[in-house]
Amino acid sequence: MPDADLSILNRVYEIILDRKQNYDERSYVCKLLNHRKGMNKILEKVGEESIETILAVRNENHEEIVSESSDLIFHLLVMLAANNVTLDEIAAELSARHESMKRD
C-alpha cells in the first residue's frame, strides 16, 4: 500500500496560520478563531467532531469514518494553531514515542 502524501496537513496548517494573522470575515477559520466564545468554540467543534467520528466507527461506515476523521483532524489543526503548537512539535513527540517503543 503506498504511503499517503501527508503534506496536505502542512498546507492546511499553513492556511490556518495565515487566517490567524490575516482576518477575512468570509473565512470559517477566522470565525472560529475570533468567535465570542473564544477557545471554547474551537473545543466544542473538536468535541463534536470526536463524537461524530466515534459514531461513524460504531456504525462501521467507512465513508463516514473518513469524512468525520477529516473534520476532526481539521479542527485539531485549528486548536493547535490557536495555541501556538506546531506540527513539528507534534511530529517530534510522535517520533520520540516511536523510538521508545522500538526499545521496549
UniProtKB/Swiss-Prot annotation:
Pathway: Amino-acid biosynthesis; L-histidine biosynthesis; L-histidine from 5-phospho-alpha-D-ribose 1-diphosphate: step 2/9. InterPro entries: HisE, PRib-ATP_PPHydrolase-like. Its main location: cytoplasm. GO terms for biological process: L-histidine biosynthetic process. Its EC number is 3.6.1.31. GO terms for cellular component: cytoplasm. It comes from the Archaea. It catalyses: 1-(5-phospho-beta-D-ribosyl)-ATP + H2O = 1-(5-phospho-beta-D-ribosyl)-5'-AMP + diphosphate + H(+). Keywords: Amino-acid biosynthesis, ATP-binding, Cytoplasm, Histidine biosynthesis, Hydrolase, Nucleotide-binding. It is an enzyme of class 3 (hydrolase). It is found in: Cytoplasm. One of its GO terms (molecular function) is ATP binding. Pfam families: PRA-PH. NCBIfam families: histidine_hisI. Belongs to the PRA-PH family. This is Phosphoribosyl-ATP pyrophosphatase.
